[in-house]
Amino acid sequence: MYSNHNLNSDDCCFDWNEEKAAELQRTGVSFDRSLTPQSLRTSTRRLSEENKQQSGTMHIDTSPSVVSDIISSRRDRSQDFFGPHSSSPIAPSERQRADQRSRLESMRLTRRRDKMTKVRGGLEKMEEMIMQGEHLREMQRLKQEAQKNALPSDMAEYMEWQNNEDLEDDELLAFIEKQETYKNELEHFLNNANKNVYENNSYPNSHT
C-alpha cells in the first residue's frame, strides 16, 4: 500500500491530501466533493453575468439602436442615389440601357434605309439603262424597216408627179363644179326676177 507522502526536489516531505484539499478549496469544492458557500456565490455570480449578457443580446436584437438607424438611413440614401447594392456601381441603369437600345435601333434603321436607297438607286439606273437599250433597238428596227420598204428614187419621182396630176385634176373638177353651181344659181335668180315682173304687170291690168 502506497503512502500519501512524497519528497520534493529539495528532499522535503509533503502530504498529497493537504495539497488536494488546498486545490479543492481554491475551486470552491470541499474535500468530499460537496459545494461550499464560496462555490455557490461564484456560481450564482457567473449565472447572473450570463443572464445579463443574454438579455443584453436579446435587447440589441429586438430594439434598433441609433447606430442601426444611421446605417439604415445611409443605406437607403445610397440606394436612392446609386441604385441597389446588388448591382455593380459601374453597371448602366435601366434608363441608360433603354437609351442605348434606342440609339442602336435608330442606327440600324438608318443603315437599312441607306442600304435600300443604294439598292433602289442601282435598280433605277439599271432600269434606265434597259429602257435606253430598248429604245435604241426599236429605233434601229424602224430604220431597217424604212430602208427595206424605201422606194427607188425614180419611183418616188413618178409617184410625186402622179400625185401632182391628181391634184390638178381635182382642182379642175372642183372649178367645173363651182361653175355649174354658179350657172344654176344665176338661172334660178333670173327666173324669179322674170316671174316677179310678170306678176307686177298683170296686177294693174286686173284693176282696170
Curated annotation (Swiss-Prot):
<protein>
    <recommendedName>
        <fullName>Regulator of Ty1 transposition protein 105</fullName>
    </recommendedName>
</protein>
<dbReference type="GO" id="GO:0031507">
    <property type="term" value="P:heterochromatin formation"/>
</dbReference>
<keyword id="KW-0539">Nucleus</keyword>
<keyword id="KW-0963">Cytoplasm</keyword>
<keyword id="KW-0815">Transposition</keyword>
<feature type="compositionally biased region" description="Basic and acidic residues">
    <location>
        <begin position="94"/>
        <end position="105"/>
    </location>
</feature>
<dbReference type="GO" id="GO:0140597">
    <property type="term" value="F:protein carrier chaperone"/>
</dbReference>
<dbReference type="GO" id="GO:0005737">
    <property type="term" value="C:cytoplasm"/>
</dbReference>
<dbReference type="GO" id="GO:0010526">
    <property type="term" value="P:transposable element silencing"/>
</dbReference>
<dbReference type="GO" id="GO:0005634">
    <property type="term" value="C:nucleus"/>
</dbReference>
<feature type="compositionally biased region" description="Polar residues">
    <location>
        <begin position="33"/>
        <end position="42"/>
    </location>
</feature>
<dbReference type="GO" id="GO:0032196">
    <property type="term" value="P:transposition"/>
</dbReference>
<feature type="compositionally biased region" description="Low complexity">
    <location>
        <begin position="60"/>
        <end position="71"/>
    </location>
</feature>
<feature type="region of interest" description="Disordered">
    <location>
        <begin position="28"/>
        <end position="105"/>
    </location>
</feature>
<comment type="function">
    <text>Involved in regulation of Ty1 transposition. Inhibits Ty1 transposition at a post-transcriptional and pre-integrational stage of the Ty1 retrotransposition cycle.</text>
</comment>
<dbReference type="GO" id="GO:0006606">
    <property type="term" value="P:protein import into nucleus"/>
</dbReference>
<dbReference type="GO" id="GO:0000724">
    <property type="term" value="P:double-strand break repair via homologous recombination"/>
</dbReference>
<dbReference type="GO" id="GO:0000723">
    <property type="term" value="P:telomere maintenance"/>
</dbReference>
<dbReference type="GO" id="GO:0000727">
    <property type="term" value="P:double-strand break repair via break-induced replication"/>
</dbReference>
<dbReference type="GO" id="GO:0061608">
    <property type="term" value="F:nuclear import signal receptor activity"/>
</dbReference>
